[in-house]
Amino acid sequence: MEQKMTNNHITIGILAHVDAGKTTLSEAMLYSTGQIRSLGRVDHQDAYLDNDAQERERGITIFSKQARLDISCGTNAADTARTADVARTADTARTWHVVMLDTPGHVDFSAEMERTLQVLDYAILVISATDGVQGHTRTLWRLLKHYNVPTFIFVNKMDMQGTDAEKVQAELRSELSDGCVDFSSQDLFEELAMCSEPLLDEFMESGEL
């Protein structure tokens, strides 16, 4: 697939099987980047992107939606939220302009979801730690591979009782790809830190990247 990313503008899509927590993640991203002032919830029928009456009544995403996030490099999420207005006028070399596409998770609306894949630079595939890899998850993975979309896997609900990070990681490797790596592991941080001096400085200071 031809690379669509230009300069500091990227398009990402959020995909998931139903009830994986995709809308919750979208709300958190919008809130942490200062695009919304309060977190909406599906069960409260006030999620920012699920603004269609049918979506709010049924508690699912039916239509693909988009939102723009301005993310300033070198700041954490809290700083970005507090300085959202400044970020919009900051030096563009230090700000990523992200178009986020929220897609339907229900299998009945797969055609609506698939239409977005051809315009993505990256995808975030949300998986519930309590449900694991579902049939629809495998379908999404195959489609992302077909359209050659680089994909980050976000494992949601890891704070739920009975979840096991090692078990989830093993399932991702066996069901999706043995190339799935845990970006929170200490070994990975150490390996990445050796790739550049700024990363090494950050790792030595905070122990994370």
Regions found by a protein language model. Give the residues of each.
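P-loop NTPase catalytic nucleotide-binding module
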Residues: 1-20, 39, 75, 93-95, ...
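P-loop NTPase switch module centered on the Walker A-proximal segment
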Residues: 2-79, 91-127, 133, 174-176, ...
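Intrinsically disordered, low-complexity tandem-repeat regions enriched in Proline and Serine
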Residues: 81-86
